[in-house]
Structure formats: structure tokens, C-alpha cells
Amino acid sequence: MKVLDQSLLWMLLPFFHLIASAAEHEEVAKHAIKLHRGKGATATQRKQWALDSCRRLTGLLRQKNVVLNKLKNAIRAVEKDTSLSGEEKLFQVHTFEIFQKELNESENSIFQAIYGLQRALQGDYRDVVNMKESSKQRLEALREAAIKEETEYVELLAAEKHQVEALKNMQHQNKSLSMLDEILEDVRKAADRLEEEIEEHAFDDNKSVKGVNFEAVLRVEEEEASSKQNMTKREVEDGLGLSMLIDSQNNQYILTKPRDSTIPRADHHFIKDIVTIGMLSLPCGWLCTAIGLPTMFGYIICGVLLGPSGLNSIKSIVQVETLGEFGVFFTLFLVGLEFSPEKLRKVWRISLQGPCYMTLLMIAFGLWWGHLLRIRPTQSVFISTCLSLSSTPLVSRFLVGSARGDKEAGDIDYSTVLLGMLVMQDVQLGLFIAVMPTLIQAGAGASSSVVMEVLRILFLIGQILFSLAAVFLLCLVMKTYLIGPYYRKLHLESKGNKEILVLGVSAFTFLMLTVTELLDVSMELGCFLAGALVSSQGHMVTEEIMTYIEPIRDFLAIIFFASIGLHVFPTFVIYELTVLVFLTLSVVIMKFVLAVLVLSLILPRSSQYIKWIVSAGLAQVSEFSFVLGSRARRAGILSREVYLLILSVTTLSLLLAPVLWKAAITKCVPRPERRSSL
């Protein structure tokens, strides 16, 4: 320790002169400002000021070299000191190296500032591109400096912690410990080892990864009415890391994985959001029920009121949407549970041909209108494909209960045809997402690469078809050998313990979801197939599972429809009401007419009457256009204006869908069957 004290004294000696001459430096700074402003700027004074500044800088650099030499000598002395343990030697040497790094970084900062000033003086103030490039270089340098400073600060914290631990060990060695103190000391050491084992060092591991950018963020604490409560909460959140971060692009972040995994944490923003949605969904859904509208209207209105265009009280929008996706999963599982595989064999040709013909017709109309309006072909294809998709969760809510009464009928029923076509559209969605990167590149590609792009698209289509064949082959094997024994074992083990049955069915659904996702097919198709496989075990199994899963589905579906409302912007709709109403009605009417024409060609004569109901179910735009639109906007396919138009048209078509569905059911379905369909 004597060596350490002497070394630190030698390190601090050069800075005593700097402290003593602080007043003189302040005068020099004031004089430099005057010179910069042109006050008292005689030639002699400017020359003398430059000479003095260079002399002082040279002296500081000379002092820095002297200190570095003394640090090297101190490091050698520590390494030769036999009285120190190996760990203590490493700690002292590391402390000296931190100080060396600080001196070198300070010197580099001086020369970087001089270089930046020189580059700025040589540049043209009218050249915005050059100034932007200079600003970008300065920003990168500041980011790198911030990372280095952050790393040094963390190392100093570790050094401080080491000193505190060394002091504690010295105190414990000088006094006798009681039995309880010895136990606590052992626990402390074990806790230290545990923290070292579970710490991942994610910052250090990822800062050098390719594609990682350093950005400045703001840390925002929750405001409290009382300043005392605010300080208390801030101290707690500083320790728990539950505050919000905001980057320069106004993206907001919440902690996902803490450094210390031994302390339990909860995202209070997310909890408040779910509680608020649950409380406001009740009056909104109740009001819609009272006036004869579907409850999903109320849930969407709830999202509008709480979203960015309303009270803006939802902070964890991404987390709410993610939880809402589970509502889609369980909704499609129940749809598959009500779906009859035997009836699927009757309509598989209709389910395959109908969506393909409709998508091709929509793309053809889109390219035609795009040619008339001089829109890029890639943009026309993308918009047409987005608008050709229909909402599977929404129509599934329409069909809940409708298939049960029709299962014993011999003719093709509208629910089976509609579900088959929607499942095929989900497959098309997965195919379109796979082809989307090629579509993005096609906008900037040369004519010589058209053949390669076509071959690439054909390869992707073949890959998707192979994945579909693998999925259906797996389903056939599961139905024959797995699902029966699995359910019987699950039912036997869950006697009087329904959570095991619920968990077993949910796990099977998630397994199918994961399999289809790994094979680049939509996760929604996996949930639907899971329900269809379980339904093959008979009517009693279907009723039992439906009784347990429906409450879970209902709650998560509320979150899903509320998350749709978060993307509804009433002010934008009001500003462009005439245009949006015209576009929405045009899209709905076009999809309805195209569906009627296609179904008239592929439906048997005995089932022609259901084409009106099926067309009404398909005459809206899928909520997945939100996802596709956001990807296309980031990729540069869509402009901001077109993206907002797609969002608004999609939302208005979803709001119009229940009215159109109710009108079609009232007009085309016999009275005894209406109650289960409405």
C-alpha cells in the first residue's frame, strides 16, 4: 500500500500547478473569447496569445509524459512487490492503467478538436452535404467517446467496490466474529460469486458486433405529485432500472432483462396499460351491446380513446400488441376446434382456387390503376396484395358457434368455405412476407437482373409449397399416431385438475405454432391446425376443451381488438373524411364484387346461395396490413401518406364489416340458423 500511496502522490503533483493557475487560465479564456469576437485583436496580441497557448500545451504534454513514465515505474514496483497477493497486484495495476487511459484520451480529445476546427475552416458553409458529413463524424466521435467514458466509469465503480471489500476484509480480520456474523459473511461471498456467474456482460459483448449503433438516449422518471415521493421513487427506480429511455428518433424503451436477475421486477407501465384497457373495455362493450352492435366495436373504440390519438395513456404499445397476438392464436385455435376435417375435404379445391383468383384479380386491377395514375409497379403490387387479404380473427368472431349447427348438414356451408379461404389467405401472407425482400429490391434493380429475380421468386414459392407439404404431412402423422394417445393421457392425469388440461392443450397449440413458424409458414395456420387436430377426437373432447379455453380467448381477444384501436387516428380521418370514405367503399365494393364473381365460377350450383355471405365475410382488409405497411414504409416502398391511407382504409373497412355481415346473414340465412351466426 505504501507503493500505491507514493505513486498516487507522484501522479497528483503535476495537477497542483494546474489548480494554482486556475485564475490565470480563466483570464486566458476570457482573452481568447475577446480575440474570437474581434475585440482587442491587434497583431501583436494575437501572436503573443498563440505563442503562450502553444507553450502551455507543450508544457502539459511534457508533464503528461513524465506522469506516464512514473506510472510505468509504479506498475513495475507493484509487480515486484512480494507482500501483495496476485489479486491485489492485478487490481493496483488495473487502477494505474485506467489513469493512463484517461491521460491518453484527454490528449486525443485536444487533437481531435483541433482537427475538427481545421476541417470546418476549410469547408464551405454553403455546402449542406459537407456540413452534414462533418456533423456525422463529430457525432460518431462523441458516441465512441461516450462508450469509452462509460466503460471507464464502470471500471472505476468496480475499483471502488474492490476497495470497500478490501476494507471490510481487513476489519473482519482484526475482530472476532460471532457465529451469525460468520454465516452472513459466507452468504455475502456466495452472493458475490452468484452475481459474477449470472452476469452476462451484454454491453461489452454486443458493442463490437457488426450493425450495432451507439445512440444517445434520455432517461425519464415518472412524475409524482409530491417531490418527496418523487425522490423516493427515483432512488428505487435507479436501483431497479425501471425508468423509460427515449432515443433521438423518439422511440421509447422499457427494461426487458435486468443486470441483476436476483431481484424480481415488474413493468408497471404495462400493468397500468392492461388494467386501463380492461376497465374501459367494459363500458365500451356494454354500450355497443345495448345498441345492437358487436362488442368488438367497443373494444376498438376503447383503443382509440386510450391510444396516441386520444388520451395517450398507453405507454407500452408494443407489449400490448404482443399480448393481443395471443388473442389471435387462441381465436384461431377455437376456430380450428369447430372446423370439421371431413368438410375441409369437400371444399379444399374452393379454398385453394378462390383466394388465388381473388389475389391475382386484385393485383391486375392494381397494376391497371397504377399505370393510369403513374404509380410504380412495385408499389401497386404491394398495395393490391395488402388490400386482397381479409381479417381472419374478425371473421372467426363472426363464425364462432355458427359451424356447430351445420356440421351434420350434407351441403357445403358458408362457414366451412369462408374458413378454408381465410386459411389459404394466411398461407399467402406467409408467402408474401417471404417474397417481400425481392419485391423491395425489384424497385431499384436493373432490367438485366429480371431473370434472376423471377428465378428467385419461383424458388421462394417452391420453398413455401415444400413447407406446406411438410406441415400437412406432419399433421397427418400426428392425427394417426400422436394426438389420440396424448389427449387420453392428458385427460387421465388431469382428473379434478383442469389447469393441467388447459396447459396441455395450450402447449400443443404453441408446439404447432412453433413448427409452422420454423417452416416459414404463418403462426396463425399452426394454431388453426392444432384446433383441427384436437377436434378429430370427437364432439365430447371439443366441447370440454372449448369450455376451458373460451374465457382465455375472450380476454385476450379484448386486448387484440383494443390494440387495433391504437392505430386509428380520428383526426386524420376527419381531415380526409371524404377521400377515406370513398376509398373504403371502393375497396369494400370491389372485394365483394370480385368474390361474388370468383365464387360464382367455382361453387357448385346447389351452394350458389352462400356466395353472398362468403363475399360479405371477405369484403374487408386484414389487420396484418398494419404490419406489412410498416415494413414497406421502412423499406421505402410506401410513402408516409400512402401508409396512413392504408391504415385508415383498413380500420374503416373493419368497422364496416360487422354491418355488412349482419345484412348478408339477415338476407341469405334462414331464420332458424340466424341466431348462431349473428
Curated annotation (Swiss-Prot):
Q: Which residues are glycosylated?
A: N174, N206, N230
Chain segments annotated as transmembrane: 286-306, 317-337, 350-370, 417-437, 457-477, 499-519, 555-575, 579-599, 609-629, 641-661
Give the signal peptide as a residue range, or say none if absent: 1-22
Keywords assigned by UniProt, alphabetized: Antiport, Coiled coil, Glycoprotein, Ion transport, Membrane, Signal, Transmembrane, Transmembrane helix, Transport
- State the annotated membrane topology for this chain: Multi-pass membrane protein
Q: Which domain of life is it from?
A: Eukaryota
Protein's cellular compartments: Membrane
Coiled-coil annotation reads 124-204
Q: Which GO terms describe its cellular component?
A: membrane
Record's function text: Probable Na(+)/H(+) antiporter.
Q: Which family does it belong to?
A: Belongs to the monovalent cation:proton antiporter 2 (CPA2) transporter (TC 2.A.37) family.
Identify the PANTHER family for this entry: POTASSIUM/PROTON ANTIPORTER-RELATED (PTHR16254), TRANSMEMBRANE AND COILED-COIL DOMAIN-CONTAINING PROTEIN 3 (PTHR16254:SF14)
What's this protein's name? Answer: Transmembrane and coiled-coil domain-containing protein 3
- The scientific name of the source species is Mus musculus (Mouse)
